[in-house]
Amino acid sequence: MPIATPEVYNEMLDRAKAGKFAYPAINVTSSQTLNAALRGFAEAESDGIVQISTGGAEFLGGQYSKDMVTGAVALAEFAHIIAEKYPVNIALHTDHCPKDKLDGYVRPLLALSKKRVEAGLGPLFQSHMWDGSAEPLADNLAIAQELLETARAAQIILEVEITPTGGEEDGVSHEINDSLYTTVDDAIRTAEALGLGEKGRYLLAASFGNVHGVYKPGNVVLRPELLKELNEGVAARFGKESPFDFVFHGGSGSSEEEIRTALENGVVKMNLDTDTQYAFTRPVAGHMFANYDGVLKVDGEVGNKKAYDPRTWGKLAEASMAARVVEATQHLRSAGNKIK
């Protein structure tokens, strides 16, 4: 199917919220990881979200120029073509963008999509993330207001992170402490600044103990029930039931019960990067170890072209990552829930 239109993306999010499921948002860094994500969604009969971080976009731009906009646009254009071959709806998103990278990433991409919309085309991306979690909340929300207005004009949804997620994601890092929990007051201030849909739709990455990266279960205290408190606190103030569309960041190592509680309390999008990176890399490492005398020219031998052909190990990587995407759709209940 074509990349999701703004109308289809809104329908996807509405269906997820009503059905208490969420879409895996898969970080990609190449055409190969993109194909793996799309394959996983197709095999699971799940619509989904594919996203590009600032680091991913820089990598896609090539190590000569490292231009984030070029990298993101190139993969997005490729995605618009290749997605036609998959029987599911896919939304394109850009992941964490801190203040110092806005002018080199999200703002130019918003301007590009605005021009496309003015020309009668759809936006290149369906949503963008502003990560102001390192900024004071007042400054964070002031920038979010500006970006939300621009995004709305381009028919794009904005994702905002108002309080820190622990660990590190593309250079944005936070300590693991009590600041990792969004308060009802934080949520009310967000609603006051950004509205509850009338100023443009946004996704809220609230913090409930989340940590980016790899950690063992039990090392971090997740409180997904906090999302219910945030929704109820804002609903009591503004009179709108379940006002927020929540995003779950830093979910590696989460238990199925924690994920289930998050879904019951309004999460519609959950980011996956660490787990899919490992799933992609593991079979490649296995292939190299098992075929070291073929992928290397050892003791004067010439190796085995079939062993070191990137397509050989690349197919293994794609299949493994796709399987991890399928698993994610099952945990998040989006499997079998594609828009017919």
Swiss-Prot record:
The active site is at D95. D-glyceraldehyde 3-phosphate binds at S53. It holds the Pfam family F_bP_aldolase. Its EC number is 4.1.2.13. SUPFAM superfamilies: Aldolase. Keywords: Glycolysis, Lyase, Metal-binding, Zinc. Binds 2 Zn(2+) ions per subunit. One is catalytic and the other provides a structural contribution. Its cofactor is Zn(2+). One of its GO terms (molecular function) is fructose-bisphosphate aldolase activity. Zn(2+) 2 binds at D131, E161. Pathway: Carbohydrate degradation; glycolysis; D-glyceraldehyde 3-phosphate and glycerone phosphate from D-glucose: step 4/4. This is Fructose-bisphosphate aldolase. The lineage of its organism: Bacteria, Bacillati, Actinomycetota, Actinomycetes, Kitasatosporales.
